[in-house]
């Protein structure tokens, strides 16, 4: 059964052009905690969508449930796999970096998904997670408009505290949290600043490290 992401993949992809400064702001925030990816490091974006973030951030692999989105992602030279986050088709300890951007709100089973992230990460591997904070003004706006948004209609937005609890349970230790998007999206004409912490910005990025006591 095709989802809205399959039926409207091009529309979804065009959002990043129509909101280029919002996209730029999110990229800057992610880069602040992601850092440079070395050629020998294996990296993957879970919920890669149409590959916008992966392409610019030099993420080699991408995974998504939408076959139509992955067709666009492949054009951006990302190695693609169709699967769900709760059942990753990769060997344990196979990636140095995992990126997830606005994916947490679509997870059917967050506990299982983050356990899978832990499994595929190498010891000291890094998860970088970008999210819309449910408790922010942006998060409240998205929730209010959910019924009319074909992409977020069935999303469950989460707070930073909720995500932190999921990470803790999966033995993923938080290292850094930053935030951006302090104004309504329609008012953003230049890249927004990035601040440490959360509670002000609508878009929050958390970095977490796989704990060393991996068995």
Q: Where are the language model's segments positioned?
A:
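Short catalytic micro-motifs in class I SAM-dependent methyltransferases
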Residues: 102-105
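A short glycine-rich, Lys/Arg-flanked "PGG" loop and its adjoining helix->strand segment in the class I
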Residues: 111-123
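A conserved beta-strand element that flanks and buttresses the S-adenosyl-L-methionine
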Residues: 99
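Conserved class I S-adenosyl-L-methionine
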Residues: 1-38, 52-53, 69, 126-154, 181, ...
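Class I SAM-dependent methyltransferase SAM/SAH-binding core
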Residues: 44-87
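Short alpha-helix
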Residues: 155-177
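Core SAM-dependent methyltransferase catalytic element
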Residues: 190-215
């Amino acid at each position: 059964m095709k989802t809205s992401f399959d039926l409207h993949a091009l529309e979804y992809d065009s959002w990043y052009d129509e909101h280029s400064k919002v996209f730029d702001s999110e990229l800057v925030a992610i880069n602040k905690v992601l850092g440079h990816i070395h050629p020998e490091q294996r990296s993957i974006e879970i919920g890669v969508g149409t590959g916008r973030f992966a392409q610019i951030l030099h993420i080699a692999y991408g995974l998504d449930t939408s076959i139509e989105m992955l067709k666009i992602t492949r054009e951006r030279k990302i190695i693609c796999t169709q699967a769900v986050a709760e059942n990753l088709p990769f060997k344990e300890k196979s990636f140095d970096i995992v990126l997830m951007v606005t994916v947490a709100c679509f997870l059917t089973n967050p506990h299982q998904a983050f356990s899978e992230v832990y499994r595929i990460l190498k010891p000291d591997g890094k998860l970088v997670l970008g999210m819309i904070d449910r408790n922010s003004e942006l998060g409240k706006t998205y929730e209010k408009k959910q019924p009319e948004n074909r992409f977020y209609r069935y999303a469950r937005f989460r707070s930073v505290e909720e995500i932190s609890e999921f990470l803790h349970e999966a033995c993923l230790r938080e290292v850094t949290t930053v935030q951006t998007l302090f104004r309504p999206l329609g008012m953003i004409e230049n890249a927004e600043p990035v601040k440490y912490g959360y509670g002000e910005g609508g878009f929050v990025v958390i970095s977490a490290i796989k704990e060393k006591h991996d068995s």
